[in-house]
Amino acid sequence: MQKLWYKVKDLFLRRKSIDSYLKYPDGKRIYRDFHELRNSMMDPDGLKIINRLVRNKYKAYFVGGCIRDLLLNRNPKDFDVVTNATPKEIKRLFANSRIIGKRFRIVHVYFKSKKKGNELKIIEVSTFRKVPEHRLNGNLKEIDHTMFKRDNLYGTPKEDAARRDFTMNSLFYDPIKEVIIDYTGGVEDIKNRIIRVIGPPDISYKEDPVRMLRAAKFAPLLNFEIEKKSFKAIERNKYEILKVNKNRLHEEFMKIFRTGISSNIMESLAKCGLFDVLFPNVIDASIQNMSKDLRAQKIQFIDTPVAKRLQIADRMLAEREDLTFNIFMSLIFADLVSDVFYPDFSKKETIDQYIKKRLDPLFAHLQIAGKDQERIFQIFIAQRQIGNVSSSQRRLIKQKQQEFKEKKYFFEAFMVYKIFSLAQENDEMIQKAMIWEIGPRTKPPMDARIVSLYYKPPKSTFTEFVEDTEL
């Protein structure tokens, strides 16, 4: 009976038009004289793709983050292309391409990057998509976090802009006419440094909870503010983040760690309420590891030991130190198992039991992969061996340390100990870290290392523009 009621109710839901989500439903064109984007700033291989698509009577534009970054005088990481050609039609035009994806098929076009010694470069080409039906009728019950097959239908540029996450990521650039096409007010929001969800934020976040993480990440990364309604909706929907697939969550964490400002981003997550949802009890444990005098004061996230450790890791990353996902995760978890860093570990339980009891629930909570769980466990187990040395034992260490240093987990364990001791400003621990730093060490494999994106400080390149002719 209840299911029947929902079906009847859905029939009478007021269906919104796409135009209600768009500031400029007909699309505002910002011409060359009123913006500073030039084709010389675009990826030359991306331009080749667009030119070939246009010659074959298709529409094709650059889209998303590359336009946003260029307007902010940043170097885009990727140049994505969007078109009204279907994946099969794109594949026919480019022999050097492959169709990928299950939920929604896109095309990867491959080139050799001359800047990176002929390393393989990928330009992602997607087809304009329609707005999901649940966005238009406001029916949150239709949202399925695993499959959106019925909503992954081809659409128009207008529909594609309306279904994107934030206004700042919804801009198109037509290199043929050198025109920015703006349906959502994204150009104004970039100029005013505002992160604004397109359409109702509650629906957008429930549709894809990763958008909450991205909003919290972009705020410090771009020096933007999250628009009030978009921010409040994160607080209401923060537990939706736990529905995200573990691979996507891992990918987002990796992106955060690569930025070189992970401490600022984690502070942003804390302000939104997402940090406590993702890492329950971590902030409380970190505060407990502060002195009584400091605990008596009003403590911000950035003042906590966990934030200090991340700040040190960020600086090391900027200095091209080799860090990994498991090092960063261990730095976040460290306050939960802080006793392992000190030689006088005296608990009724064994050190293995102590670590597992405190971390296993968090591993399950975050869906951390088994191999990463094992490595983080090894990192913390190794802390006592690293800490149980002194300069007077140096000769003994020289005889025995090499075997320990050759362990696959040693480098990560050592880096966690070193960063922990620096954050604690513990001279004795720092000296012990220096002992272990002498001589060769086995480093993690290249594919496990985090490479910083080295973002430049934000600097706008806007000129004043006028509201011009509409599409």
Locate predicted features.
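Catalytic cores of the polymerase beta-like nucleotidyltransferase superfamily
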Residues: 1-471
